[in-house]
Design a protein with these regions (language model features):
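Conserved catalytic-core motifs of eukaryotic protein kinase domains, centered on the activation segment
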Residues: 135-136, 166
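Conserved class I S-adenosyl-L-methionine
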Residues: 155-166
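Short catalytic micro-motifs in class I SAM-dependent methyltransferases
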Residues: 128-132
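A short glycine-rich, Lys/Arg-flanked "PGG" loop and its adjoining helix->strand segment in the class I
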Residues: 137-153
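Conserved N-terminal segment of class I S-adenosyl-L-methionine
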Residues: 8-127, 137-140, 156
Length: 166
């Protein structure tokens, strides 16, 4: 029985891994009748609050936004930085961001787990994204080991995904 249980757990793990490889990031960002991906509160209240909170701690230099969605927060970051790189898994979200912002930012269509970034960054912003990742620890490790410049700063906001309001 122990071997049988071990085998079931292994199959379950393989099924989970297979499911993770088939994620459709374009579908995940779509609003439906019973699910909204983003709310006006995020844009009208949270975005200005986060910018005010981050602003005194931003370093001069470049910025990497991980999970740029449709560019709404990116627009606010572009008011403060000349060089902004955005990594987003949804091609549809990148297309919409480009329609809004043009070529003011550099867009990389990739998952964080596999992104090949050209440099290190003085500021890295990860807002309302960590809870969506398949392996958040691995992504945080990449941020620290590969992408954050010496003396760079990580700005991380993670909502309580299990809050009663969600």
């Amino acid at each position: 029985r122990i071997n049988g249980l071990s085998m079931i757990m292994t199959l379950d793990f393989r099924e989970q891994l297979h499911m993770k490889q088939k994620r459709d990031y374009n579908a995940e960002i779509r609003d439906t009748a019973d699910h909204r991906y983003a709310y006006g509160f995020d844009f009208d209240v949270m975005h200005p609050y986060m910018i005010r909170s981050f602003d005194p701690f931003f370093r001069a230099g470049n910025l990497l936004e991980l999970g740029s969605f449709k560019g709404d927060f990116t627009r606010r970051l572009l008011e403060r930085f000349d060089e902004v790189t955005c990594v987003e898994a949804s091609g549809n979200a990148i297309d919409e961001a480009k329609r809004k912002l043009g070529d003011k930012a550099t867009y990389i269509h990739s998952r964080f787990e596999t992104a090949a970034l050209p440099m290190r960054y003085d500021n890295i912003v990860l807002t309302h994204v960590l809870e969506h990742l398949d392996d958040p620890v691995a992504v945080l490790r990449r941020i620290n080991d590969e992408w954050l410049a010496d003396g760079g700063r990580l700005f991380l906001v993670c909502p309580n995904a299990n809050a009663p309001s969600r």
